[in-house]
Amino acid sequence: MINNNSLKEERLTSARSRYYDTIVIGGGQAGLATGCYLKKQGQDFVILDANERIGDAWRNRWDSLRLFTPARFNGLPGRPFPAETYYFPTKDEMADYLESYAEHFQLPVRTGTRVDRLSRRDDRFVIQAGDLKLQADNVVVAMSNWQKPRVPAFARGIDPEIVQLHSSEYRNPSQLRDGAVLIVGAGNSGAEIAREVAPKYPTWLSGRDTGHLPFEIGGLAYRLFLARLIGRVLFHRVMTVDTPIGRKARAKLLSKGMPLVRVKPKDLDAAGVRRVPRTVGVQDGQPMLEGGRVLEVANVIWSTGFHPGFSWIDLPIFDEGEPQHERGVVASEPGLYFVGLTFLYAASSSMIHGVGRDAEYVVKDIQTRQRRSWQSEGLERLPEREAQHKVPSRAKDIAQP
């Protein structure tokens, strides 16, 4: 007698446990570029992304955000960004481009899937995402170093009547209370938000001077030669981990961040933004600056960056929270790769136009690794598969019998 409940459970178990040649974790620009090269190689793979929609990592930034790079540098492999050469896309336009890219190449992106744990069992990687369990010979972690908002512990002592937002939560000035605004962190996000907020509220910008680029992006000199010189030559070919100047720049970038790109000190002055020292603590519920000055504010925006956020990777590959790799290849865990990290190989590695080169490099390594495996088994090429895996696009789909 057939037990229908047993058959149903067997189908559910099969749906929740699958094997792939390669699993890509992260469906942003790094993951999609990797997917493009994997598809060209005929790989059996899937891309997992925690967001409900491709491009949401861009959509969920502040409303007025525009990219620092013009359209000519914002295309992924095989598909240029659809805009005039020196147009600076909005964050929503970038998000829509990524979505159309995945559709154009028919990449198998499974959205709404947050990975809880990556571990290893024998010669395969195991990925746990809710009740979904996947296995793979190769895993590409395709995301940036900066995943979890960083806010100093002393922020808990700030008066609860004061609005506190991290820059990842800020959308526009309508979120703020009437009264003064303190923006902590004087990098690019802090400077851009400060200039936007200052016409509406008294605004302080707290933090060290990060320096700034000595030219206007989008200006005549930038269009004539600086864009190509910086984007294609300096950031992409000169400033790499293979050169002394690149290694020095990498250390500085990872420790201090980028200089101001679009918003310059003169722009902050013109907007009425007041510069103050670092914020180091709290006194009587109000933020206190280095030197002891206390500011009375109604709002605090923490533009203090992000932590790596790789705690879900249960593998011994980290040194002070950063994955140890060589050009994205983790030698201590064969088959594990990274794409999208800040200065993974070059200054352009975390930029749209630079991520494709790193993706191509790791996919070639995956192919080489597979070829060696086949040869060790006496095969000249990968055997034909009986069927390609079909992947549901939403977590709810996987629970269907």
Regions found by a protein language model. Give the residues of each.
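Redox-cofactor-proximal catalytic regions of oxidoreductases
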Residues: R53-G78
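Flavin (primarily FAD) cofactor-binding/catalytic cores of flavoenzymes
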Residues: I2-G27, L32-N51, G55-A57, Y86-P401
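A short acidic, helix-capping loop that chelates divalent metal ions and anchors anionic groups
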Residues: P80-Y86
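A short small-residue
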Residues: L76-P80, G340-T342
